[in-house]
């Protein structure tokens, strides 16, 4: 079966309204896939096809590559996008380029559109061996699948079972032109080291090693899927879909292996970077097994894991707002820091109506200066007439510690009046 027919058969499995966005680097692999998709579109004019080129700016030839890709798409009458990204070398060029690439693509992906990439069988071999080098478990060794979700992006890899030789033969027959990235010869990058030095020797010794590794990757993927299936009922009992938290109240009744598997399942649900073995052991020791009065944290990528009242939470890295004071007047709206949204104070029926997010309260009018703060450690007078520590008020309202400094506090002068939407001070 030729490449075009294989691609046709795979696309037939998708709903007819599915749109395609091809990741187009201009290299051999994506050029072949672009050609195949363009041919299919001639047979199926309703097929929605666009191409996106990510300009990493890492090569002096990057501008020329973008021009080349645009010209190829113009020749084929394919809608073309080019997105420039900035790479942070301190995070590792390969890893950061990949993350930046997917983020840029996510900004352009439309409803009912999937990302199509030109990964082939040899790419799968490299991905498997790199995962092995990192000490990955089944999840990582499952490598790439024809259909998957990465960074919340639906991805389709129609060439995954094709060899590099098949793509080269197609390109030669069709007289395609493509670019050669000079960095592919740089063995400082792990993938290039495998591709240029190690894998040729392995293939010389074992001719079918790529197929064998692809089978192993598929076995690992299927075993991981089975584990997920077996854990599904238990996971759904302890996972709160509303606030995306995980209950660890009954974790002590599970084996350590099951605890770790449930943690990984939760992190996978949230699309959070999988922890290393050391990180997972730290989470187990410092978060799961910590004393109940502790509120430990653990940073994973750009997320922070937190524990409060026998539940695990995942939050972004939060800005410290404890020192911030914001002046505000009646009939004024201001934006709060760190993406907390807008807060408005409006006079209404001899009261001050405060609106923030989905919360709304009424306070008495005042001639004093009105200020918004995010920290108060004094006492609060309750409606019943007695006083209570601010910490106890937060606890009574089940507000986790890290959220307490993210709720706007209204002050009249230096007098605390209200934690908006939670409780007031009746002093």
From Swiss-Prot:
Binding positions for ATP per the UniProt entry: 25-30
Tagged with keyword Transport: no
GO cellular component: cytoplasm
GO terms, biological process: tRNA modification
A GO term, aspect molecular function: tRNA(Ile)-lysidine synthase activity
Localisation: Cytoplasm
Listed EC numbers: 6.3.4.19
CDD domains per record: TilS_N (cd01992)
Reactions performed catalytically: cytidine(34) in tRNA(Ile2) + L-lysine + ATP = lysidine(34) in tRNA(Ile2) + AMP + diphosphate + H(+)
Record keywords: ATP-binding, Cytoplasm, Ligase, Nucleotide-binding, tRNA processing
Enzyme class: ligase
Pfam families according to UniProt: ATP_bind_3, TilS, TilS_C
InterPro entries: Lysidine-tRNA-synth_C, Rossmann-like_a/b/a_fold, TilS/TtcA_N, tRNA_Ile_lys_synt, tRNA_Ile_lys_synt_N, tRNA_Ile_lys_synt_subst-bd
Gene3D superfamilies linked to this entry: 1.20.59.20, HUPs
Domain remark text: The N-terminal region contains the highly conserved SGGXDS motif, predicted to be a P-loop motif involved in ATP binding.
Described function: Ligates lysine onto the cytidine present at position 34 of the AUA codon-specific tRNA(Ile) that contains the anticodon CAU, in an ATP-dependent manner. Cytidine is converted to lysidine, thus changing the amino acid specificity of the tRNA from methionine to isoleucine.
Family assignment from sequence similarity: Belongs to the tRNA(Ile)-lysidine synthase family.
Protein's UniProt name: tRNA(Ile)-lysidine synthase
Gene: tilS
């Amino acid at each position: 079966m030729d490449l075009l027919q294989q691609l046709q058969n795979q696309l037939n499995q998708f709903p007819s309204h599915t749109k395609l966005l091809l990741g187009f680097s201009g290299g051999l692999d994506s050029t072949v896939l672009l050609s195949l998709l363009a041919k299919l579109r001639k047979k199926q004019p309703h097929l929605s096809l666009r191409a996106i080129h990510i300009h990493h700016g890492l090569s002096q030839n990057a501008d020329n590559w973008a021009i080349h890709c645009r010209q190829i798409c113009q020749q084929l009458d394919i809608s073309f996008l080019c997105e420039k990204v900035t790479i942070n070398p301190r995070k590792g060029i390969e890893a950061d380029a990949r993350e930046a690439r997917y983020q840029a693509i996510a900004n352009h992906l439309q409803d009912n559109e999937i990302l199509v990439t030109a990964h082939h069988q040899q790419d799968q071999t490299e991905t498997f061996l790199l995962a092995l080098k990192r000490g990955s478990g089944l999840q990582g060794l499952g490598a790439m699948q024809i259909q998957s979700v990465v960074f919340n992006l639906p991805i389709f890899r129609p060439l995954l079972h094709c060899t590099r030789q098949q793509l080269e033969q197609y390109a030669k027959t069709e007289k395609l032109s493509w670019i050669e990235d000079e960095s592919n010869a740089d063995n400082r990058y792990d993938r290039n080291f495998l591709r240029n030095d190690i894998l040729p020797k392995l293939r010389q010794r074992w001719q079918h090693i790529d197929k064998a590794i692809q089978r192993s990757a598929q076995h690992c993927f299927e075993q991981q899927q089975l584990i997920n299936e077996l854990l599904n009922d238990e996971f759904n009992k302890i996972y709160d879909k509303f606030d995306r938290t995980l209950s660890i109240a009954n974790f002590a009744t599970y084996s350590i292996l099951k605890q770790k598997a449930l943690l990984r399942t939760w992190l996978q649900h949230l699309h959070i970077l999988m922890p290393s073995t050391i990180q997972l052991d730290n989470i187990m020791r410092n978060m799961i097994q910590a004393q109940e009065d502790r509120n430990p944290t653990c940073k994973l990528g750009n997320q922070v894991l937190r524990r409060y009242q026998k539940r695990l939470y995942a939050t972004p890295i939060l800005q410290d707002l404890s020192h911030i004071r914001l002046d505000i007047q009646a009939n004024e709206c201001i934006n709060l820091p760190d993406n907390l949204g807008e807060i408005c104070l409006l006079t209404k029926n001899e009261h001050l109506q405060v609106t923030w997010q989905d919360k709304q309260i009424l306070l008495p009018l005042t001639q004093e200066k009105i200020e918004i703060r995010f920290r108060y450690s004094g006492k609060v007078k309750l409606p019943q007439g007695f006083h209570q520590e601010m910490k106890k008020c937060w606890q009574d309202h089940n507000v986790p510690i890290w959220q307490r400094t993210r709720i706007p506090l209204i002050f009249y002068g230096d007098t605390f009046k209200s934690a908006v939407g939670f409780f007031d001070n009746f002093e």
